[in-house]
Amino acid sequence: MKILFLADANSIHTIKWVESLHKHELNILVFSLFKPTDDVVQKYQNWGIPLISADLQSKIRNLRVPNISKLNYLTAFRLLKKTMNAFEPDIIHAHYASSYGVLGYLSKFKPFILSVWGSDVYDFPQKNQLNKWLLKKVIHSANTVCSTSEAMKAVIATQFDRFDVKVIPFGVDANVFAPASESPDQFTVGTIKSIEAHNGIDCLLDAANIIINEYHNTYIHFLIVGQGSLLGEMKQKTTDLGLDNYVKFTGYIPHEKIVEFHQKLSVFISVSTRESFGVAVLEAAACGVPAITSNVGGLPEVNQNNYTGYVIPPNDPEKLANSIFKLFKDKNLKDQMEENARDHVTKQFNWNKNV
């Protein structure tokens, strides 16, 4: 069977799907709007998977267009049609509705599978009515729509009148994401998120301030991984709160280092104000790390309150600080949640089963 993937070749989620389906001896070609990095190209070559790139970023830059709009995506459509004619796919599978999904819709190819990822459903249609109209067209053009969470499936039903969505969560390879052989030397609270307003980094810093400066606990440290438009502002806030000795920002880390990051943690934090799924929570859980998450989007599906961690309202640093402190004070509770977290992932979110 020939499957044409319309997806960002650089995305770790695309890479995982392609590698796993390739192991099932499916014939796959990846069509990416943007140029893949050299290491990604090498991975696809090692698997013997052809990769076509529209290199849209370079073309837009050469045309001196200030940003990439949906109209700019149409410049890649001619290359896509040429690719389809040469490859003759049996199935087209587009990942991310508001870009690759648009190309799948325009191709008029059937069968067409659409996988929605999050911001394509939560953010893109909220910008204007044209976006919402376009996304509804894309969603209804697909033979099958796949969502990573029940929460996002509900949004697609209520906002776009598509009710037969299949839920296939992002899974975790528990052989790769596994507990460290030894416990961490210090109690470290961590998160891996883009440093943007909706991801609750400011809430985490406020909770750190409560723990350090109000609870007077100097044994808990904080590790924040990621980059984004608010990184400088969050670093300055850390300094202003007098937390520089307790909070470390690492910036971006490559995916192959994420296991090592999780294994350093005592507690993982994800207190976003919106979240389609929460794969990082599952990766932490597979490493035996309990989580504290907000009760939004798909997060309650991956983190069970009082079992694998705590589920709290977003923007509530007092509750976040209190939940962290509970796990710090009660080692037996933390040990049990570590065991529960690992068990939950291996039984409910096994990557091979999801594939």
What role is predicted for each listed range?
Residues 252-253, 260-265:
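Short alpha-helical donor nucleotide-sugar binding micro-motif in glycosyltransferases
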Residues 290-293:
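Short hydrophobic beta-strand element within catalytic cores of glycosyltransferases
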Residues 151, 171:
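Carbohydrate-associated surface elements
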